[in-house]
Amino acid sequence: HGRLQRYGPPQGVSGPVPASNVDPLGVPVFSAAEAAALFARHAPVLEIDVAGEFDRIGALKLDAEDQVIVDAAAPIVYTRLAYTLLGGLIHPQLVYTFWFSERPRSPGSTLDLLAGRLDGVVWRVTVDARGDPLVYDSIHACGCYHLFFPTEKVVARELPVTLDESLFVPQSVPAARSGERVVLRVESGTHYLQRVLMTSEAQSATAVVYRLEDERTLTTLARRGGGTRSAYGQDGFIAGSERAERWFYWPMGIESAGQMRQWGHHATAFVGRRHFDDPQLFDAYFEVRH
């Protein structure tokens, strides 16, 4: 119900991905330049249904009251390098987070349990030793809506039926090849991920360019009166981004459900136990095809 707007990384920054070195513990090691090349290669194009300022991505900043806000005049996607176990090997994970100023109330509603200040979407790419995608997955920055998008290089494991929340795979995605980029189709307002597509580098040239920035900078945001502070509190949450849903979901054991939170604080299941940064998560769900 808005206008489709594409955001993309700078053109000409997705050259060949360097082979990583591996330390004695089997952990892939990258120089700063190698990590930057890997993030540039797999940075997604965002295709957002823009119906208001709340649908524009931007940089997290502090306002005059020291509250965290989004500056949509500076489109930024934040990055983090993580790791996971899969098929007996440690694989790099490229984590991209983009922020919106709010999730507005649903049109016509007087009470929307999910609405509130700030909203974020996290997109993660798990790659093999050659830097090629194995699995994509996504959550919102509160930890909700965990979706998996496997490529043809992995197969889902047969798991016993339990009451725990199971693997949710809305679609499979072909591994992006040279000259291709993943496109994330994002709904207006809710910022739900609706579809994952592929586009060529040439077709993404008309996108508004965003900048990639290390997510660790969010722990030292500049204050208007001088000095810095973290976007997150000591509890790992962003103050002011609470949701009314927390009063309904507290019996499920998730503290302040719906509130935006820091890496390491993303529980992704209300039934059972599942955390976004669990290093054994992918090995439990997938096998690598040989």
Place the predicted regions along the sequence by residue.
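Domain-length functional cores that host ligand/cofactor binding and catalytic or interaction surfaces
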Residues: 1-14, 117-119, 130-290
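Short N-terminal edge-element motif at the start of the domain
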Residues: 54-136
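Solvent-exposed N-terminal domain segments of exported/luminal and surface proteins
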Residues: 1-88, 240-290
